């Protein structure tokens, strides 16, 4: 099995990565940073997001495993004191995995160029100064004219991240749906939006067409993109999926409870 270890720079992660690398070598695993079959991330959810984007062009052949060295991570199933148990699980691996939907982001600019991105959690559109104005279409049909600070489009797993902070619903990842939430929308007698999260069907897509300004900022997960003048952004569920090696089974709602409520501890 080809394995690589991807870690952040905090001391606990570096120590855990060194220990894991040593055990992998003694266990006769092939360490392959370029074309791994399994990517073990050590850190937190941010580290896993970075690894996802690092290997976004190899998603069909890679499974991810998350080890957290700080606070509990939503994508991480292992703690740094369980490194030996993780290596045993890798040795007994039979290919078991679980997959989650991803967000396909297609941006078209006023100069006729375009860019394509994949997001594990979410993508947002905001304006640097003043009120953002954008037309919103669902499956090609006009839905509303939005005015406010911004819009957030998320995956089911991303529904527990920034989208939740915007009042979005938590969506089970078995649903191939995307969710759009508003960021401080303007609502009065003149300007009206739905003022509610929108959850779309698997065959639907959301299109944003911002109007009149070139100071918009787009984010894709943790990355901030300052593009040229945006003509259109189209969001849909991607054909690609992210795969996690699943040696332990933790129900999604148990994971949500553990991350946000913690009443069982």
UniProtKB/Swiss-Prot annotation:
Enzyme class, UniProt record, top EC level: transferase
Q: This protein's superkingdom?
A: Bacteria
Q: Indicate the transmembrane segments per the record.
A: none
Q: Known SUPFAM superfamilies for this protein?
A: NAD kinase/diacylglycerol kinase-like (SSF111331)
What InterPro entries does the database record attribute to this sequence? Answer: ATP-NAD_kinase_N, ATP-NAD_kinase_PpnK-typ_C, NAD/diacylglycerol_kinase_sf, NADK
EC annotation?
2.7.1.23
What GO biological process terms are annotated to this protein in UniProt? NAD metabolic process; NADP biosynthetic process
Q: Which NCBIfam families match?
A: PRK04885.1
Protein name per UniProt: NAD kinase
List the gene name.
nadK
């Amino acid at each position: 099995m080809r394995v690589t270890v991807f870690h952040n720079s905090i001391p606990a992660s570096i120590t855990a990565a060194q220990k894991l690398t040593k055990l992998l070598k003694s266990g006769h695993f092939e360490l392959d940073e370029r074309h791994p079959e399994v990517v073990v991330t050590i850190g937190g959810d941010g580290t896993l997001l970075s690894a996802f984007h690092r290997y976004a062009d190899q998603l069909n052949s890679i499974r991810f495993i998350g080890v957290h060295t700080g606070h509990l991570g939503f994508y991480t199933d292992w703690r740094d004191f369980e490194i030996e148990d993780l290596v045993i699980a890798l040795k007994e691996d039979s290919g078991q995995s679980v997959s989650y939907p991803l967000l396909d982001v297609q941006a078209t600019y006023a100069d006729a160029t375009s860019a394509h991105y994949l997001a594990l959690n979410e993508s947002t559109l905001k304006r640097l100064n003043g009120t953002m104005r954008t037309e919103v279409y669902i499956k090609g049909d006009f839905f509303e004219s939005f005015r406010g600070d911004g819009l957030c489009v998320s995956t089911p797993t991303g529904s527990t991240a920034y989208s939740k902070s915007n009042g979005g619903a938590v969506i089970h990842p078995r649903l191939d749906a995307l969710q759009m939430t508003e960021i401080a929308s303007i609502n009065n007698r003149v300007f009206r939006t739905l003022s509610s999260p929108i959850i779309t069907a698997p065959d639907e897509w959301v299109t944003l067409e911002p109007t009149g300004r070139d100071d918009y900022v787009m984010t894709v997960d943790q990355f901030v993109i300052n593009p040229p003048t945006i003509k259109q952004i189209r969001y849909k569920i991607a054909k690609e999926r992210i795969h996690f090696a699943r040696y332990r089974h933790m129900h999604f709602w148990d994971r949500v409870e553990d991350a946000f409520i913690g009443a069982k501890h």
